[in-house]
Amino acid sequence: GEGVAASDLALQAARQALDAAGLAPTDLDAILVATISGDYIWPSTACVLQNRLGANNVMAVDLSAACSGFIYGLSVAQAYIASGRYKTILLVGVDMLTKTVDWSDRTSCVLFGDGAGAVILQARDAGKGVIDTVLGADGSAADLLCIPGGGSRMPMTEEVVQKGKHFLHIEGRKIYKHAVKAMAQATLDVLARAGKTLQDGNLMVPH
């Protein structure tokens, strides 16, 4: 809504995750925030969240990977923990995409919303955890889903705004075909790496 920023939603989710884990902000070693619609271009929303939580001097960084941002964050957090660098990490996925869409464009505005989710990841000697992740990217499709204006390629000007270049642009049919193919392949790849098949799973949550 009006006056609400990404860090506001992130803060709510982070506090709920910390409460559920029985932890305080001072117990955190790192904060990762996956977002493409942060409070500012810079500083990072992770830094804003760190300050608002009271997790002073904790490492805080944003990850910009759109819909796959949370999975990228999960993989980065897992690697940090496995390396021994950090033991307790807060990972937040948050976006406020209703502020980036052109509400007169019904092909895009109905697809995007606002929300946040948070998890706490900790080092454990045994038990359940993140088994594996498979990541990939294809920059050749960058122009199919983007916000053209506002970056160093097309700095924000009056003309950019008048042309609507500050709004989210999507070529839905092409993105759909591209995404479904990539998601299916990534699913098969991660199962193969883990020595599993689709029949071994009880739940699959696609996006």
Predicted region positions:
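Phosphate/pyrophosphate-binding loops at sites that engage ATP/ADP/AMP, CoA/4′-phosphopantetheine
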Residues: 13-29, 185-202
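Buried hydrophobic positions in well-ordered alpha/beta secondary-structure cores of metabolic enzymes
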Residues: 17, 28-31, 49, 73, ...
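Conserved catalytic cysteine-centered active-site region
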Residues: 1-8, 35-89
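Condensing-enzyme catalytic core mediating Claisen C-C bond formation in acyl metabolism
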Residues: 1-3, 105-177, 181, 185-188
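Flexible, glycine-rich active-site loops centered on histidine and acidic residues
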Residues: 82-116
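Glycine-rich phosphate-binding loops at beta-strand->alpha-helix junctions
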Residues: 34-40, 201-207
